[in-house]
Amino acid sequence: MLILTRRVGETLMIGDEVTVTVLGVKGNQVRIGVNAPKEVSVHREEIYQRIQAEKSQQTPY
């Protein structure tokens, strides 16, 4: 795992088209902004896991 330190307003790049910007820090919460092309799905981990669980529960036709 790559670990990076960023300050509010600073950005990191993932590939050529995805940016992650630190928008704010309040207590133990960090607000981040993700800018990605429409074809790149961006989800919180718990939402992604729910989507994957729903996909695995669907019966194939």
Swiss-Prot record:
Main function: A key translational regulator that binds mRNA to regulate translation initiation and/or mRNA stability. Mediates global changes in gene expression, shifting from rapid growth to stress survival by linking envelope stress, the stringent response and the catabolite repression systems. Usually binds in the 5'-UTR; binding at or near the Shine-Dalgarno sequence prevents ribosome-binding, repressing translation, binding elsewhere in the 5'-UTR can activate translation and/or stabilize the mRNA. Its function is antagonized by small RNA(s).
MF terms in GO: mRNA 5'-UTR binding
Location relative to the cell: Cytoplasm
The entry's keywords: Activator, Cytoplasm, Repressor, RNA-binding, Translation regulation
Organism of origin: Sodalis glossinidius (strain morsitans)
Coiled-coil region(s): none
Primary site of residence: cytoplasm
Subunit comment: Homodimer; the beta-strands of each monomer intercalate to form a hydrophobic core, while the alpha-helices form wings that extend away from the core.
Identification of the protein by name: Translational regulator CsrA
Keyword RNA-binding among UniProt keywords: yes
Similarity comment: Belongs to the CsrA/RsmA family.
GO BP, sorted A to Z: mRNA catabolic process; negative regulation of translational initiation; positive regulation of translational initiation; regulation of carbohydrate metabolic process
Listed HAMAP family: CsrA (MF_00167)
Record NCBIfam families: csrA (TIGR00202), PRK01712.1 (NF002469)
Pfam hit, one: CsrA
GO CC terms of this entry: cytosol
InterPro entries for this protein: CsrA, CsrA_sf
